[in-house]
């Protein structure tokens, strides 16, 4: 039996429980004191907060990793941050130029971007044209193609530009590598252990950053959603030469609210029309998401 006294007519509601402050620890990946940041809702605001904490310009930050100072593309910060995650900011280091001759259709690059204007190399395919150029490394930001600045371009735009470059004609890439700590110098894609390595959170709650509107605390994606997003990310790489876990998650979210393949195609066009996904990609994605759900039961 409910023993609570009935509320008198006109009585005010009890005050809402205060939302806890979400404070995140951060360091510069090449080495710095630990800073603390809060009050951001998207990646650009996050970069501004990190820059303010360390007295640098936001445009100095190329990308961030979670719980590791290394240039580890599996630890890239995307649209979700675990509430206990430690944020490492990788800032601009040396600029370098390389000349490339496109002897095959594909260069062997997979591109991603930081959500704040910089596209960078996420993967280099073994045995590819780029793999044979020692100066080009995973984590390098692509600043210009043939002196044409691509700062501000999205990853899919950069990938398209590279695909459309004519074969047998040399071109120049201007790259900016992340500034490296002493123990990381000379490493192409791996680095030795850092004395300060943050603990990885085992919690399921994350802060989800949004390009519009306030950030929200949400449960981490389910195993089914995570598996489906990984398959979509693989297809993004295969069809478009990019990897983008947040875009993949948005595609899965669109599929979840679609009654069938045609509704899914319309939903993608409405929400993510700027990407101009090819029809065969949409068909494969719909099938892959269904297979991921079946595989996970």
Swiss-Prot record:
Coiled coil: none annotated. Keywords: Deafness, Disease variant. Pfam families: GIPC1_GH1 (PF25083), GIPC1_GH2 (PF25082), PDZ (PF00595). Expressed in adult lung, brain and testis. In the inner ear, it is expressed in the inner and outer hair cells of the organ of Corti. Also expressed in cochlear spiral ganglion neurons. Signal peptide: none annotated. InterPro entries: GH2_GIPC, GIPC1-3_GH1, GIPC1/2/3, PDZ, PDZ_sf. It comes from the Eukaryota. Residues 97-177 form the PDZ domain. Belongs to the GIPC family. Required for postnatal maturation of the hair bundle and long-term survival of hair cells and spiral ganglion. It is linked to Defects in GIPC3 underlie the age-related hearing loss 5 (ahl5) and juvenile audiogenic monogenic seizure (jams1) phenotypes. Ahl5 mice show irregular structure of the stereocilia bundle of outer and inner hair cells, late-onset degeneration of the organ of Corti. The spiral ganglion exhibits a severe loss of neurons. This is PDZ domain-containing protein GIPC3. It comes from Mus musculus (Mouse).
